[in-house]
Amino acid sequence: MQPMKSKKLYLALIIGVLLAFLTLSSWLGNSGLVGRFGVWFAALNKKYFGHLSFINLPYLAWVLFLLYKTKNPFTEIVLEKTLGHLLGILSLLFLQSSLLNQGEIGNSARLFLRPFIGDFGLYALITLMVVISYLILFKLPPKSVFYPYMNKTQNLLKEIYKQCLQAFSPNFSPKKEGFENTPSDIQKKETKNDKEKENRKENPINENHKTPNEEPFLAIPTPYNTTLNDSEPQEGLVQISSHPPTHYTIYPKRNRFDDLTNPTNPPLKEIKQETKEREPTPTKETLTPTTPKPIMPTLAPIIENDNKTENQKTPNHPKKEENPQENTQEEMIEGRIEEMIKENLKKEEKEVQNAPNFSPVTPTSAKKPVMVKELSENKEILDGLDYGEVQKPKDYELPTTQLLNAVCLKDTSLDENEIDQKIQDLLSKLRTFKIDGDIIRTYSGPIVTTFEFRPAPNVKVSRILGLSDDLAMTLCAESIRIQAPIKGKDVVGIEIPNSQSQIIYLREILESELFQKSSSPLTLALGKDIVGNPFITDLKKLPHLLIAGTTGSGKSVGVNAMILSLLYKNPPDQLKLVMIDPKMVEFSIYADIPHLLTPIITDPKKAIGALQSVAKEMERRYSLMSEYKVKTIDSYNEQAPSNGVEAFPYLIVVIDELADLMMTGGKEAEFPIARIAQMGRASGLHLIVATQRPSVDVVTGLIKTNLPSRVSFRVGTKIDSKVILDTDGAQSLLGRGDMLFTPPGANGLVRLHAPFATEDEIKKIVDFIKAQKEVQYDKDFLLEESRMPLDTPNYQGDDILERAKAVILEKKITSTSFLQRQLKIGYNQAATITDELEAQGFLSPRNAKGNREILQNF
């Protein structure tokens, strides 16, 4: 690679010197300072490039320098920029040729193109080349350049078009956007038609004026015209006269439905007869014979209304006697038409009643999104829990919710206007990145509002995941979590925090119907979901829980809520707790409650001993369960009274900081935790393990495999989120109890908000419990110093030292890691044993290579 770089540098220097000489020749060619070659090159350059000959070579040198700085000059971006520079030079050559008639290259191209596109086409081509070059070189999207001007131009042309129509068409009225033929529009049209008819009645008709049908070139064929002769009118036909009546009487305007309700109105046959009598006899020239056509049933109501309007003008002529057959036929026609009118009126009324309330169509969403009040996936998880009546303890009173503060709720969910505005901002921002789609559902809760976005079929989900920061900036949100895709759905979940968050109280969850009816004694109150409904889980079905969260994420609040929910469900003889608190302050408030099996453990060494004691208790329980041939703790406790043995209480180990325990004990802490997690479920042993640092060295593969159910509050990085949840998203949580939960057997994550309980409330509950019963610690779990794992063996007769010597003499290997693997102990203890063997003279100090030699045998 080094020779290649040197060759590239030498080539660049040679080209640079050559271009510098040619540039000076173009500038100083006529002075003779650059010799004959310089004079010749200057004339040649000016001949082909005109006035651009003074800048074309420096411009070329600059472009070549940019290519030299690029590692790979054949990428798409570099070729695109090269095309931009080339188009810019060509446009300048064309422009120079058109304006100054300079440069052979521009003149040749101009003379070639002029016969085809003319001068106007040349200027348009130059403008197009300049614009494309500008967009390529400055990386501007065409939308940001043209769209503002296109919108303004479009609006201006629309306004000019409307003004022209108004100027040349007096009856023009701009169309209103919306839905036509509503009941109000029909009423307005009828009122307008009535006014026009009254105006026509007031103006006298010019007798010399001819109707359009009388002019040969204006005659319009009418399908309902019929021949007017002395024959009787045919049934089902309408007679239309081309001559308006010269004598008529104006009657007051009537309601079009009066004929159906008022029996005093003249019948239809009288109106038809009077209309026929007042019409003059037409000539043969004015008649247009047509083939009689039957009236369609759907047109009957319309024609009837028109006949009523025409027949309101009745002349004062005596009535003629009519044939009884004609009267019978006309009565039948009248009855049939009235029935059709009534049926159509009923249909119109039903359509008007069933018509939805239309709102103006917005360009953001074709359909208004559905507001969801309950999540189906959460309901399915909650339905899988056990519910029923819970037996109250006989000699113990469970704490009441009256010990907790009263719930003071305030509605912090977004209103519809704010949700619509967020939807509009969200869709407009997505469309700027060419991501089309629509919002189909929304979930509004106490902390966040979730929008389910259905992208277009051509949109990749990975493109949406990378827009969380851009969307957060657009919506002025603290952080946005994008869940893509949601398993089992064709949508992407976009969770946006509310402007005001609601405090979720523990009392509200404990008083909920879900918690009260849950029959499991290990029910945990996790909080509320994203729509504000309470959410609980059963620790027996988890069966262990791994919790992670940074400082201020609400991890301690969530753990306290779980402990309090266990204390609200269980008396001391049914539940025992082992609390490990390396920080010495988190669990100190629970000191000396009767549910504790040991005092609160703050020393990591004693914590490892307690975990080993729990593992031994697990083995003891399994041996007894095997003796009585039962598989679970529930079956054993049911048979305990008949077998004359004591029932097993549930034993829960709560570890506040796993990182400190792993740092101190290492494998000694990891093995008992993994062993309890693997086998403790059936014997009633469960783990709740919390940590602030979910790194790989803390949450090892062995622990992670055996703790499938996890809760993650806000963490620092995506890597921490993937360690605890196997996916990212926890880094985008809001803190203050906002968490993600992986329920057993469910696909995906559940976002929850942990309930809050103050220290005063916890003290009240603890005092209430301690007032009923005193604590009794189990001596088997209180390990003495002699039974603790040794970190500094200091005597010759120690078994572990003898085992270490035997292994070293057998394998002839003295490394610390070898002892760790063979003795199955932690690295720190193995290093301590090695140092002790060196102090006893069994091993030599490390040599230059870091190895030790065996100095003595048994």
UniProtKB/Swiss-Prot annotation:
ATP binds at residues 552-557. The chain crosses the membrane at residues 9-29, 48-68, 74-94, 116-136. Keywords: ATP-binding, Cell cycle, Cell division, Cell inner membrane, Cell membrane, Chromosome partition, DNA-binding, Membrane, Nucleotide-binding, Transmembrane, Transmembrane helix. Residues 175-218, 236-330 are annotated as: Disordered. Coiled coil: none annotated. GO terms for biological process: cell division; chromosome segregation. SMART domains: Ftsk_gamma. InterPro entries: FtsK/SpoIIIE/SftA (IPR050206), FtsK_alpha (IPR041027), FtsK_dom (IPR002543), Ftsk_gamma (IPR018541), P-loop_NTPase (IPR027417), WH-like_DNA-bd_sf (IPR036388), WH_DNA-bd_sf (IPR036390). Residues 137-858 are cytoplasmic. The keyword Transport does not apply. It comes from the Bacteria. One of its GO terms (molecular function) is DNA binding. This is DNA translocase FtsK. It comes from Helicobacter pylori (strain ATCC 700392 / 26695).
